[in-house]
């Protein structure tokens, strides 16, 4: 019997395909050339993997490895192929555990436990096996199983962190991916075969290795590896502290919440952060010649609360801190430059009156009395309201702004008078041993919650603006992070369980017809891994209060 023919609109052209054909076959037969490979499709606005089959008339859009979602799928697929190749080379009996930790440069840092020796020769063999799997276009399968069956499967394969994670999942089904004999669970979509996995490298690093990956803008080139040792060691230290509390993965956190509650974890985390801030203040004071504390970090890092808490610690050490916001040195709005999209660019250095900033700061350093400006965000004008300042022996300026680590901002100030601090929310928790939590996700959820509370901004608006925020960070903050004298991790191991309560209603408010719905759906799925906790026990000086409300600081 002939199969029913269905209408499929691709790039404005209506085509006919038989019901049940795979999207892979449609892509291959379309004759449409794309700059980079098609890895997923959008079917009536919904993402679908290429092994899925056509069920009804639809509009079809191709998602390539150069698209954000497509590139994330590519990276996830490389990780799956890597894991299979490790077991191929070492033998399953010689590998107890392979763990993904955090991003390093353009790649991911992994460690491995077991009898297999981790050296460059081993990595070269793994790399060769990955290319073999890719050259053979080894299929990547997907099947849906009952949650109980998935838990048993994870136990059988000694994936105990996944086993613990799914004990707390409310879903009845779990998607399991496989490449040959190797089964695993991944949070997110996957390629339909290993043939995509062409561009990567493996390099020994610290106690493990780095899986090097391309950049999305050029997905066929591996950029040179530049170790970021300072931020790496901050992440490693945070992870080690989490491990000391027996909370490395989301399942561990959920287990702790259900058995003991969160109070002790909360108090220990807050104490660790306070000790870190105190150490930073002690170092600043002990160096003796610092007058300008330059604080920078990406969006929603908790810079404002951190500045307040550092100021308190500096005061406790006998100093007299004065906050200075670089935003007060914005040029008048009519003089703000435009970005490549024709929009006002408030995040570039050129939006700041750098000359006036240096003139004022140098005058303060020389003991002069200076009237400081205040930027009026309603009128878009810089104003002077009689705010005078003169620095004495114990006075010190705490300067917060995204360009704080860039010496072009403070070019006239002597290097020895500056102390640079980089702050970011470097998530120390992962979903499980093979599914990391990107630090950007934690910051985006923080921002969604804060902006809704303080600015009345919808989650839809925050998500829509996020790519622009990220571009500003890539250009103005991340290139200078290793210039910092010290780094501070503002992430709290329990925070996503708390933020969930505030973020979920905001994300559910995004309609399915909106372009931001896909990201909202992804974040909701992510938050569903966590058991929620109330915010009542969070101290009022906590960095997290900057986002959920109730801070004792003016944030």
Sequence positions of predicted segments:
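Glycine-rich phosphate-binding loop used to anchor ATP phosphates in small-molecule kinases
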Residues: 358-416, 466-480
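Hydrophobic positions on the alpha1 helix immediately C-terminal to the Walker A/P-loop
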Residues: 306, 310
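Conserved lysine of the Walker
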Residues: 303
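Auxiliary tRNA-acceptor-end handling modules of aminoacyl-tRNA synthetases
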Residues: 52-73, 85, 94-105, 109-275, ...
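Short beta-strand-centered segment that lines the nucleotide-binding/catalytic pocket of NTP-utilizing
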Residues: 317-334
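Hydrophobic anchor at the beta1->P-loop junction of P-loop NTPases
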Residues: 293-295
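Conserved nucleotide-sensing/catalytic segment adjacent to the nucleotide-binding pocket
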Residues: 331, 335-378
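Conserved NTP phosphate-binding and transfer environment spanning the P-loop NTPase/kinase superfamily
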Residues: 288, 411-555
């Amino acid at each position: 019997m002939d199969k029913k023919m269905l209408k499929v609109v691709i790039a404005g052209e209506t085509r006919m395909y038989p019901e049940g054909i795979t999207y892979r076959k449609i892509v291959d037969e379309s004759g449409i050339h794309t700059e980079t490979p098609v890895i997923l499709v959008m079917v009536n606005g919904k993402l679908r993997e290429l092994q899925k089959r056509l069920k009804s008339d639809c509009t079809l859009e191709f998602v390539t490895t150069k698209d954000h979602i497509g590139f994330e799928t590519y990276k996830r697929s490389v990780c799956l192929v890597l894991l299979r190749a490790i077991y191929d080379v070492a033998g399953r009996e010689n590998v107890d555990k392979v763990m993904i930790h955090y991003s390093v440069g353009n790649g991911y840092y992994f460690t491995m436990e077991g009898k297999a020796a981790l050296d460059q020769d081993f990595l070269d063999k793994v790399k060769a096996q990955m290319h073999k799997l890719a050259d053979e276009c080894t299929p990547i399968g997907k099947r849906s199983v009952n949650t109980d069956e998935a838990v048993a499967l994870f136990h059988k394969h000694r994936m105990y962190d996944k086993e613990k994670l799914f004990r707390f999942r409310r879903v009845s089904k779990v998607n399991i991916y496989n490449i040959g004999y190797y089964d695993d669970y991944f949070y997110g979509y996957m390629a339909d075969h290993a043939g995509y996995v062409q561009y990567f490298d493996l390099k020994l690093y610290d106690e493990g290795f780095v899986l090097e990956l391309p950049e999305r803008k050029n997905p066929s080139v591996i950029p040179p590896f530049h170790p970021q040792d300072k931020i790496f060691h901050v992440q490693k230290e945070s992870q080690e502290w989490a491990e000391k509390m027996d909370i490395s993965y989301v399942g561990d956190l959920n287990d702790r919440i259900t058995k003991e509650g969160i109070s002790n974890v909360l108090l220990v985390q807050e104490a660790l952060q306070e000790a870190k801030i105190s150490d930073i203040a002690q170092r600043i004071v002990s160096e003796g010649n610092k007058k300008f504390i330059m604080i920078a970090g990406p969006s929603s890092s908790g810079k404002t609360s951190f500045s307040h808490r550092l100021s308190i610690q500096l005061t406790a050490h006998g100093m007299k801190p004065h906050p200075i916001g670089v935003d007060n040195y914005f040029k008048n709005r009519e003089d703000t430059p435009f970005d490549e999209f024709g929009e006002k660019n408030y995040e570039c250095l050129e939006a700041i009156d750098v000359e006036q900033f240096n003139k004022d700061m140098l005058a303060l350093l020389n003991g002069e009395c200076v009237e400081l400006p205040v930027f009026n965000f309603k009128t878009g004008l810089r104003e002077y309201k009689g705010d005078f300042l003169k620095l004495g022996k114990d006075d010190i300026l705490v300067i917060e702004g995204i360009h704080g680590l860039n010496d072009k901002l403070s070019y006239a100030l002597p290097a020895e008078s500056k102390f640079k601090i980089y702050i970011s929310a470097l998530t120390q928790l992962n979903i499980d041993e093979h599914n990391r939590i990107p630090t950007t996700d934690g910051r985006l959820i923080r921002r969604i919650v804060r902006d809704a509370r303080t600015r009345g901004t919808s989650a839809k608006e925050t998500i829509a603006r996020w790519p622009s925020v990220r571009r500003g960070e890539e250009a103005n903050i991340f290139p200078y992070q290793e210039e910092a004298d010290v780094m501070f991790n503002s992430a709290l191991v329990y925070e996503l369980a708390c933020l969930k309560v505030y973020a979920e209603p905001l994300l559910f408010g995004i309609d399915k017809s909106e372009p931001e719905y896909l990201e909202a759906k992804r974040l909701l799925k992510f938050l569903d891994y966590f058991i929620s906790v109330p915010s009542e026990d969070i101290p009022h000086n906590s960095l997290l209060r900057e986002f959920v409300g109730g801070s004792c600081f003016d944030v």
